[in-house]
Amino acid sequence: MAGDTHCPAEPLAREGTLWEALRALLPHSKEDLKLDLGEKVERSVVTLLQRATELFYEGRRDECLQSSEVILDYSWEKLNTGTWQDVDKDWRRVYAIGCLLKALCLCQAPEDANTVAAALRVCDMGLLMGAAILGDILLKVAAILQTHLPGKRPARGSLPEQPCTKKARADHGLIPDVKLEKTVPRLHRPSLQHFREQFLVPGRPVILKGVADHWPCMQKWSLEYIQEIAGCRTVPVEVGSRYTDEEWSQTLMTVNEFISKYIVNEPRDVGYLAQHQLFDQIPELKQDISIPDYCSLGDGEEEEITINAWFGPQGTISPLHQDPQQNFLVQVMGRKYIRLYSPQESGALYPHDTHLLHNTSQVDVENPDLEKFPKFAKAPFLSCILSPGEILFIPVKYWHYVRALDLSFSVSFWWS
């Protein structure tokens, strides 16, 4: 049984009045709250937003809450029509405004921590599905809400040892003997110039040691710590062995629910918090990591670096694929087995024909169908077992396959 994975119904943690802290983030009057929406948003929706804002500033909480629900329902339909890339950003702003108003209404007279947790979930939905509004106000609201929640309790059940000692799934349970394979070289804190000349420019993978092992996350992060900092936050979770499988899907749940369902208890399915910009959503976690100095060798600005979290149980798999940017993969918890193939070997890796999966191989790396994919057997590769504190440099377009050998948390930095 999963146990209590939600934030408990306890008295609020008092650090000043919650409503006072939230109200201080808002413009003084409704006239100062600029919406600035484009022509694609119907006039009737703009009018509804203006009316909801007026209701909020007039203190008519119940009516404002009702209006915000209408805004959210209508804009949700717009967000889920067609492909995500084609959704107009103004509709994402409308959704974010609806989330802001609803969260604020919920917090005007909170009764217990469950009410604040519900408001926090609304904020997270705005952060995940909406667009930035009013100087990233949803981030600020979420941060305040977290300070007014009581300490998070870990999900009930036996927390696995770290690294995870549960039996691995039968299909991918073996730890490969990388001594039999050509391994990725390891270097201890190479100079920027040496890294640039020997690895960045020629596009050669390398594992960097002594660069990240002093980061706070290496000592602080555990299941309990992650639950304490992020337990009540809503995140996207991939369900299924790998994203190329037909039964693969995505869902939204809190971090507590994810840990309880896919890590603490014996799961029927594989769950993976993968490729999520968790550190933008929860800046407190971002304080525990650093951007590697080697990223300064790129052409882009620091704010253009994409930082993703990869958190899941033993057995999670990222199929063989390539990315359009340079990648530093930092291992924080657990170990991962990784295979790397040069872009020059693309013809032997049989990429999918579809536009959506053109950067992903059809080959199951550790159980290949060599009758269907005969060239794969002769494709040379590098491999490694990446351990906590190590950083793997994956050059742009380099094919890579990743399998978690333990309960694992990785951080990737995509840069140009």
Curated annotation (Swiss-Prot):
One of its GO terms (biological process) is fibroblast proliferation. Residues 1-110 are annotated as: Interaction with RCCD1. 2-oxoglutarate binds at Y272, S318, H321, N327, K336, H400, W414. One of its GO terms (cellular component) is nucleoplasm. Binds 1 Fe(2+) ion per subunit. GO terms for molecular function: aminopeptidase activity; chromatin binding; endopeptidase activity; histone H3K36 demethylase activity; metal ion binding; p53 binding; peptidyl-arginine 3-dioxygenase activity. It is found in: Nucleus; Chromosome. This is Bifunctional peptidase and arginyl-hydroxylase JMJD5. It comes from Homo sapiens (Human). The gene is KDM8.
